[in-house]
Amino acid sequence: MNILERAALTALHRMDPEKAHSLSLSALRSGLVPLPGPVTSPRLATDVGGLVLPNPVGLAAGYDKNAVALAALMRAGFGFLEVGAATPRPQPGNPQPRLFRLTEDRAAINRFGFNNDGAATICARLAMRPRGAVPVGLNLGANKDSPDRAADFAAVLAACGPHADFATVNVSSPNTERLRDLQGRQALTALLEGVMQVQAGFARPVPVFLKIAPDLSDADLAEIAEVALASGIAGIVATNTTLARDGLRSAHARETGGLSGAPLFERSTRVLARLSELTEGRLPLIGVGGVASAEEAYAKIRAGASAVQLYTAMVYQGIGLAARIARGLDALLLRDGFGSVAEAVGTGRADWLT
């Protein structure tokens, strides 16, 4: 991390977390933030569910919810970006305060509740984005007051799919009441059928991923793996934030909402490894949760991930983190004799299944 990045983070950490979040996006939009540019190599370039990535380090949904800083983020060293979640209609989300830094734990708790500008506005921004080598996907959400949340996911995909490189069905946010109920076999099967019917009507392929919670039993994971394999989706994103609060030290540890960051790493990686085992490598997995270094990204890949995503770690390490992780990952692959990311996927899975 350079001196300028460190100074900017220090200033942002003196502010309310949500205001700091908004200011960071405004700074990116201004064009004044120094950015590392693209990071790739023959080892890092990879294919995940039909997405061709310059490197496997992605930005998780939730940072640029409304797709307002895409031009800058595409130059920040990420191999792919995910914006949203977008819902059919704009909604304000939950009352503030709803974002909390847990500095001692290198973590955050949020209870945003899918606050966003709505699908129409976000779709228009996706359509106007610069085209380049960095795929941009959309996290699909449902309105809080919707009488048919499954239909909401399909509606957002229908509206925005032509302008997105991929889409993620988010049934795992803990901040919309009863949303996680859609992870059950019957509900999930019906939901994915509706989404995949929409996808089938597109003129070009738009891979669809499913994002799951880390707070699932082994039986739940087995059901999800079975449904996912049968549905025709491109892969699974594992995982979203957790409701667990084990071992936290920060003053905000008991705030309600989803916990992200360092404390999620082990839990999410164990879920990832179990999914890799259940799907027998037939379904690409994207590992999310606590990735803050090249070593942690590499651990996710060796546990079964074909790519990784991060967000909370940027709160503590800055916008240049993705590029640093990608370069470090390249060195780790070279050190261990892997010619590609794909060669390393799942090679350490057994370590996470004990």
Swiss-Prot record:
GO molecular function terms noted in the UniProt entry: dihydroorotate dehydrogenase (quinone) activity
Catalysis: reaction(s): (S)-dihydroorotate + a quinone = orotate + a quinol
Compartments, as annotated in UniProt: Cell membrane
Note accompanying the cofactor annotation: Binds 1 FMN per subunit.
GO cellular component: a single term: cytoplasm
Pathway where it operates: Pyrimidine metabolism; UMP biosynthesis via de novo pathway; orotate from (S)-dihydroorotate (quinone route): step 1/1
Binding site for FMN: A61, G62, Y63, D64, K65, A85, N139, N170, K211, T239, G261, G290, Y311, T312
Membrane topology: Peripheral membrane protein
SUPFAM superfamilies linked: FMN-linked oxidoreductases (SSF51395)
Keyword Isomerase: no
Swiss-Prot/TrEMBL cofactor(s): FMN
Amino-acid positions noted as binding substrate in the UniProt annotation, renumbered to this chain: K65, N110, R111, F112, G113, F114, N170, N175, N240, T241
Top-level taxon of the source organism: Bacteria
Enzyme class: oxidoreductase
Record-listed E.C. numbers: 1.3.5.2
Keyword Oxidoreductase found: yes
BP GO annotations: 'de novo' pyrimidine nucleobase biosynthetic process; 'de novo' UMP biosynthetic process
Annotated keywords: Cell membrane, Flavoprotein, FMN, Membrane, Oxidoreductase, Pyrimidine biosynthesis
Catalytic residues (positions): S173 (nucleophile)
InterPro entries in alphabetical order: Aldolase_TIM, DHO_dehydrogenase, Dihydroorotate_DH_1_2, Dihydroorotate_DH_2, Dihydroorotate_DH_cat, Dihydroorotate_DH_CS
Function noted in UniProt: Catalyzes the conversion of dihydroorotate to orotate with quinone as electron acceptor.
Subunit architecture: Monomer.
Family: Belongs to the dihydroorotate dehydrogenase family. Type 2 subfamily.
Protein name (database record): Dihydroorotate dehydrogenase (quinone)
Organism the protein comes from: Cereibacter sphaeroides (strain ATCC 17029 / ATH 2.4.9)
